[in-house]
Regions:
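Accessory alpha-helical/coil subdomains and C-terminal extensions
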Residues: 5-8, 12-16, 36-48, 163-245, ...
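Short beta-strand segments
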Residues: 12-14, 92-94, 117-120, 154-158, ...
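Short acidic, glycine-rich surface-loop motifs adjacent to enzyme active sites
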Residues: 84-99, 241-253
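Short Gly/Thr/Asp-enriched flexible loops that form oxyanion-binding sites at enzyme active sites
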Residues: 92-114, 256-265
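C-terminal non-catalytic interaction/assembly regions of soluble proteins
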Residues: 253-333
Length: 333
């Protein structure tokens, strides 16, 4: 009987806390991304028994320094690895600050049903009790699992599996720092033992209309945080500095003051796409609820938080969509 070959998993290391190091095992301060991919792999006992591993140091940054250029390069690399059949699954080690944004971007532009799994850690590798090694073990296990196919990009942290569409960071320091409000977990992974609870219900990866092939830059989209007595001149400043889109992290159901709403309507009339999201951690932003989106020319974000709304709006603008199709996209994705 022929032996079943081990799955091939390629690790793309981008830096982050999982590769961080501090002055001592109990020092809360540390530098992100100082460990290389080989040290990360060698630090996880039994990892090479899960899959045939290859790895590369894609970048060495804290995820606060992730940017559009790195996203485009990362998407191109993932798509190239799959197109060349060089991996059955890919793990991306990443800082937690912007993991949800990188994950959602890849969720919309990777053109394969093979698993892409983001992981990271809340504690640096030098910590007294680092969470990174087990997170990496679980992530490689998921990337090796045929059951992970066609579930889009998965974020694997602290034994939980999240869809990149739904996940958000909810704590600055807790090890249990990520939640998927409303939608809930995709599943769990405990010491490599995987259970799935559901599959994503919105289009993703090979089912997504979005592609960044040949794209060298992303449109500028700004996020403005709404608050009591918010000055409307922030809207004018954003538009004057070249933003093609503005996402409002609105109060409640995506609300803003009358003055801000009128100013947003003015820039929307001049071609800037305005998306209303919410600074609240869960719930939908409905269209034409308290604000007249039809009259103002706004887009309602539906279920996407401000940072995810920015990603989708960038891709919509890069695809040349107008406000009507962009609203449709927010309802679909």
């Amino acid at each position: 009987m022929d032996e079943i070959p081990m799955p091939r998993v390629h690790i793309l290391a981008t830096g982050g806390t999982i590769a961080g190091s501090g002055a001592s095992s109990v020092d809360p301060g540390y530098r992100s991304g100082v460990m290389g991919v080989s040290a990360l792999v060698d630090g996880v006992v039994g990892l090479r028994s899960v899959a045939v591993l290859t790895g590369e140091q894609f970048s060495q940054v804290g995820s606060q320094d992730m940017n559009d250029g790195l996203w485009l390069s990362l998407a191109a690399r993932v798509n190239a690895l799959f197109a060349a059949d060089e991996a059955d699954g890919i793990v991306i080690t990443h800082g937690t600050d912007t993991a949800e944004e990188t994950g959602f971007f890849l969720h919309l532009v990777v053109k394969s049903d093979r698993p892409v799994v983001l992981t990271g850690s809340m504690r640096p590798a030098s910590s007294l009790s680092p969470d990174g090694p087990l997170n990496l073990f679980n992530a490689v296990s998921v990337a090796s699992d045929p059951g992970a196919r066609d579930r889009g990009v998965i974020v694997a942290l602290n034994d939980d599996l999240h869809s990149a569409r739904d996940v958000t960071k909810s704590s600055t320091t807790d090890v249990q720092a990520f939640i998927s409000p409303g939608a809930g977990l995709l599943g769990t992974a405990s010491y490599g033992r995987i259970r799935y609870f559901r599959s994503p219900t919105h289009p993703h990866t090979s089912g997504s209309e979005f592609s960044v092939e040949g794209l060298v830059a992303m449109p500028r989209v700004d996020i403005l945080y709404a608050h009591a007595n918010m000055p409307a001149d922030l809207v004018r400043a954003s538009a004057s500095l070249g933003a093609q889109g503005i996402v409002i992290a609105g109060m409640g159901n995506g609300n803003v003051s009358t003055d801000v709403a009128n100013t947003l309507a003015d820039v929307a009339g001049k071609g800037v796409i305005v998306v209303r999201s919410s600074r609240v951690s869960s719930g939908d932003v409905g269209r034409n609820i308290e604000l007249d989106d039809d009259g103002f020319g706004f887009v309602a974000s539906d279920q996407l938080n401000p940072q995810k709304s920015r990603v989708l709006l960038q891709l919509c603008l890069a695809s040349g969509l107008g406000s009507g199709p962009i609203q449709d996209a927010f309802f679909r994705y």
